[in-house]
């Protein structure tokens, strides 16, 4: 999770040394990693907080007409830089679409892994696994190289999908007691923040405060049957809830 405060803030460091382990979908991680916090000045922007988890709905009932109309104009980039209307990702199939905070985020890498662990269940049900991150295609490709994520990965450099879905953003939903515990747990489990990715221009300009979510959609571009909007960093729903929405 990228940390960005005023440039006058004291720089701190945290050193955590979990045991060497191999994580499904992420490869082998090494012990003895030093996490150095970097701070920059940012504008504090926060979208409206909208949290919902809707299953069994159809014909776009999980999102409102205004949101559905906004999504019609959203395009994301594949790993080669090709523009794709976001609704094409589920127009002809059902898909679980996870939205990362950013491509360097340790909590998002854990989210990617816990979804990838259930990819065989999704495959058996004909459900695609997709991850979208706000950032550049270079960041997206680095994420794939580092994590070995087996699903599809797309970049949203303009944050258009996040704004259309009204995902929450702000300091108060990034630095919370629960989020801090989630970060520590993630490090002890062997996950790692990529600080180089976290402090690239595409992420820093937004302050690193963006939160994500998960939706289940398709087939049919207006068929979003489940949507979960993160209330704070690391707010992952139970994987059983997602599987019930996509594969029951």
Swiss-Prot record:
Gene3D superfamilies: Glutaredoxin (3.40.30.10)
The keyword Plastid is annotated on this UniProt entry: yes
Disulfide bonds: none
Keywords (A to Z) from UniProt: Acetylation, Chloroplast, Plastid, Transit peptide
Origin organism lineage: Eukaryota, Viridiplantae, Streptophyta, Embryophyta, Tracheophyta
Organism encoding this protein: Arabidopsis thaliana
Entry GO terms, CC: chloroplast
Transit peptide, residues from-to: 1-52
InterPro entries: PXL2A/B/C (IPR032801), Thioredoxin-like_sf (IPR036249)
Modified residues (N-acetylalanine): 53
Regions annotated as coiled coil: none
UniProt xrefs under PANTHER family: PTHR28630, THIOREDOXIN-LIKE PROTEIN AAED1, CHLOROPLASTIC (PTHR28630:SF11)
Domain of life assignment: Eukaryota
Protein name: Thioredoxin-like protein AAED1, chloroplastic
UniProt keyword annotation of Transit peptide present: yes
Family note: Belongs to the peroxiredoxin-like PRXL2 family. PRXL2C subfamily.
Intracellular or extracellular location(s): Plastid, Chloroplast
């Amino acid at each position: 999770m990228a940390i960005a405060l005023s440039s006058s803030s004291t720089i701190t460091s945290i050193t955590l040394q979990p045991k060497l382990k191999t994580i499904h979908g992420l490869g082998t991680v090494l012990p003895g990693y030093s996490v150095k916090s970097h701070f920059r000045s940012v504008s504090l922007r926060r979208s409206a907080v909208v949290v919902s988890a809707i299953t069994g709905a159809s014909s776009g009932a999980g999102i409102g007409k205004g949101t559905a109309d906004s999504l019609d104009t959203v395009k994301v980039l594949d790993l080669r830089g090709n523009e794709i209307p976001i609704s094409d990702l589920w127009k002809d199939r059902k898909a679980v679409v996870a939205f990362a905070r950013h491509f360097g985020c340790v909590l998002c890498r854990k989210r990617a892994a816990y979804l990838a662990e259930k990819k065989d269940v999704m495959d058996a049900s004909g459900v695609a696994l997709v991850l979208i991150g706000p950032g550049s295609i270079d960041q997206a490709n680095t994420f794939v190289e580092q994590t070995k994520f087996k699903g599809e990965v797309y970049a949203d450099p303009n944050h258009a999908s996040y704004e259309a879905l009204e995902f929450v953003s702000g300091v108060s939903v990034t630095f919370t007691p629960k989020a801090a515990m989630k970060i520590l747990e993630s490090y002890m489990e062997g996950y790692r923040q990529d600080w180089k990715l976290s402090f690239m221009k595409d992420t820093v300009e937004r302050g690193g405060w963006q939160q994500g979510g998960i939706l289940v959609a398709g087939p049919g571009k207006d068929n979003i049957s489940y949507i979960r909007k993160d209330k704070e960093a690391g707010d992952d729903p139970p994987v059983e809830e997602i599987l019930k929405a996509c594969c029951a």
